[in-house]
């Protein structure tokens, strides 16, 4: 049996011994070593101590100590891609799809709960666990899938930030200039953690507050009908909806649940000092992290709601000609030319959305919108960079210096964006948003299936392994994501013409299905289908009920 990397090689003897005897001996279960590779200097170097107290029950002091990772995670729910999806959904469907936003956020919370549990119980993030359990080829493929997801997300975030700079400068800063500014300030802000982890988390909290205030201001100014908003949130139906509304609903799910965010969150929870040998401390950490995540995602839901409701109230089924005429007679008349004079329904994006707000409610609304987009883009770009670092460290076990690793992970995402920004105008650039949201949805199984696999693996998770209800819920989410992806493919195929497109797409589709099937196979083994286990994959089939030596977890 061939090893796959130093850490994997260290696991093979125990596994081989167990296979030779044909037993599921707990002492031979391959588990990750406590410190597989020493980390270079990163966000995770500082551990936040948790106050000790004998007072039983919930403690707000402890909740405050655990507060931070959940709000950083929630920024992925507020990036420019989400904002654009929100405003398009409001303009196309009004308030009819607010319930989709609510339940997509709930589904995202369920995924983040698994990421929390994996990081807290094992002391390792999802990428590190993948490195130790998957053979070389599957784990390299998983790393590539996550890098593609991060690059796609980063393109949305950097483009959104560049558009914000363009709006704030009245077009004086070109898109490529905005991208260059984003590169510089992101690298600067990323080194804020040298002054303390809590200061960095406070800075992210400040950016979220800016988003809440700016988008909340737009909500108060437009004054949507509150009864209709509540009906849209709590009544799960869409009267009179067709294909266009369905595409928007599917796009919401793709925009809300980001694959790399699951990897990110499993890393962020490692920043709290938890004694993993004590089951009660692990249980308490899981509870407080989940509470914080619920609060953070509630805030993100409100901010997304503000955007969707504003455009659902003011711009639902607006015509280009009406918007053009309104802009001509406004204080931002220089933007009127971007809306053609015809009777077609206006198609909005981040750029046009800000312009429309300026045309209807004054220049202040435009600039406040741009500030909100700037905060969304800046914060999500920073967390995307951290996700890239953690994914690369975990999957490849790199020992690079801090600056080299930050520069490399930034370049992977920034260079494609800079190239696109230099040769496209605003309307073409923002039109990429739908495609990039589809990309996130397509790549989501490569995060959901591994985290479901390992949180169901009792040798790794002990008493914190997924129960039957958790397994069923996450299996339903995985099925929903796969169904969405099938819908996208079926909807996209008729737009292609000629074998030059169909043949490469067909090959990619076959490879995609094969890899998802592989992940489903290993996930099934972890869930107890031992008859599927062969060779090294017996590591996914052990039913361990006793302590497993070597795992720094609760016993």
From Swiss-Prot:
GO terms for molecular function: cadmium ion transmembrane transporter activity; iron ion transmembrane transporter activity; manganese ion transmembrane transporter activity; metal cation:proton antiporter activity; transition metal ion transmembrane transporter activity; zinc ion transmembrane transporter activity. The keyword Zinc does not apply. It comes from the Eukaryota. InterPro entries: NRAMP_fam (IPR001046). Residues 82-90, 169-172, 223-245, 313-354, 424-434, 494-501 are extracellular. Glycans are attached at residues 329, 343. Induction: In response to lymphokine or bacterial products. Residues 1-63, 111-147, 193-201, 265-292, 375-405, 456-471, 522-555 are cytoplasmic. NCBIfam families: nramp, Nramp_1. It is found in: Late endosome membrane; Lysosome membrane. One of its GO terms (cellular component) is plasma membrane. PANTHER family: NATURAL RESISTANCE-ASSOCIATED MACROPHAGE PROTEIN 1, SOLUTE CARRIER PROTEIN FAMILY 11 MEMBER. This is Natural resistance-associated macrophage protein 1. It is a multi-pass membrane protein. It catalyses: Zn(2+)(in) + H(+)(out) = Zn(2+)(out) + H(+)(in); Fe(2+)(in) + H(+)(out) = Fe(2+)(out) + H(+)(in); Mn(2+)(in) + H(+)(out) = Mn(2+)(out) + H(+)(in).
């Amino acid at each position: 049996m061939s090893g796959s990397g130093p850490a994997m090689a260290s696991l093979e003897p125990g596994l081989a011994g167990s296979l030779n005897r044909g037993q599921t001996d707990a002492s031979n279960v391959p588990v990750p070593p406590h410190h597989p590779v020493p980390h270079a200097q990163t966000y995770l170097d500082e551990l936040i101590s948790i106050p000790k107290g004998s007072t039983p029950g919930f403690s707000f002091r402890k909740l405050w100590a655990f507060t931070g990772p959940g709000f950083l995670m929630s920024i992925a729910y507020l990036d420019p891609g989400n904002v654009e999806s929100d405003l398009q959904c409001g303009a196309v469907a009004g308030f009819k799809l607010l319930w989709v936003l609510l339940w997509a956020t709930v589904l995202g919370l369920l995924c983040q709960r698994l990421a929390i549990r994996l990081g807290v119980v094992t002391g390792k993030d999802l990428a590190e666990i993948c490195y130790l359990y998957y053979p070389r080829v599957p784990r390299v493929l998983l790393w590539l899938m996550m890098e593609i997801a991060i690059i796609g997300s980063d393109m949305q975030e950097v483009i959104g930030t560049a558009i914000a700079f363009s709006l704030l400068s009245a077009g004086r800063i070109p898109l490529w200039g905005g991208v260059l500014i984003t590169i510089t300030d992101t690298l600067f802000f990323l080194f804020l953690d040298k002054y303390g982890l809590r200061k960095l988390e406070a800075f992210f909290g400040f950016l979220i507050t800016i988003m809440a205030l700016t988008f909340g201001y737009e909500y108060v100014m437009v004054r949507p009908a509150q009864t209709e908003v509540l009906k849209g949130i709590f009544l799960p139906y869409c009267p009179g909806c067709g294909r266009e509304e369905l595409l928007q609903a599917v796009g919401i799910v793709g925009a809300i649940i980001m694959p790399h965010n699951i990897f990110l969150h499993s890393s962020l929870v490692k920043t709290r000092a938890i004694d993993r040998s004590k089951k009660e401390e692990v249980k308490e950490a899981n509870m407080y992290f989940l509470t914080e995540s619920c609060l953070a995602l509630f805030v993100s839901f409100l901010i997304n709601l503000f955007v969707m409701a504003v455009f659902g109230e003011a711009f639902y089924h607006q015509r280009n000609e009406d918007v053009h005429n309104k802009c001509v007679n406004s204080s931002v008349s220089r933007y009127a030319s971007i809306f053609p004079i015809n009777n077609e329904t206006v198609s909005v994006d981040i750029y046009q959305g800000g312009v429309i707000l300026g045309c209807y409610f004054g220049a202040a609304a435009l600039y406040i919108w741009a500030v909100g987009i700037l905060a969304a883009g800046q914060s999500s770009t920073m967390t995307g960079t951290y996700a890239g670092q953690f994914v690369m460290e975990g999957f490849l076990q790199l020992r690079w210096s801090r600056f080299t690793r930050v520069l490399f992970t930034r370049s992977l995402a920034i260079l494609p964006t800079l190239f696109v920004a230099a040769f496209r105008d605003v309307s073409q650039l923002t039109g990429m948003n739908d495609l990039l949201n589809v990309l996130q949805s397509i790549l989501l199984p490569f995060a959901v299936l591994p985290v479901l696999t390992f949180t169901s693996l009792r040798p790794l998770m002990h008493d914190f392994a997924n129960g039957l209800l958790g397994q069923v819920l996450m299996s339903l989410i995985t099925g929903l994501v796969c169904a969405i992806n099938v819908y996208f493919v079926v909807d996209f195929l008729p737009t292609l013409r000629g074998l030059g497109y169909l043949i490469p797409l067909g090959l990619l589709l076959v490879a995609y299905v094969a890899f998802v099937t592989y992940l489903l196979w290993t996930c099934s083994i972890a869930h107890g289908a031992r008859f599927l286990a062969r060779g090294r994959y017996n590591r996914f089939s052990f039913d361990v009920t006793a302590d497993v030596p070597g795992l720094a977890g609760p016993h």
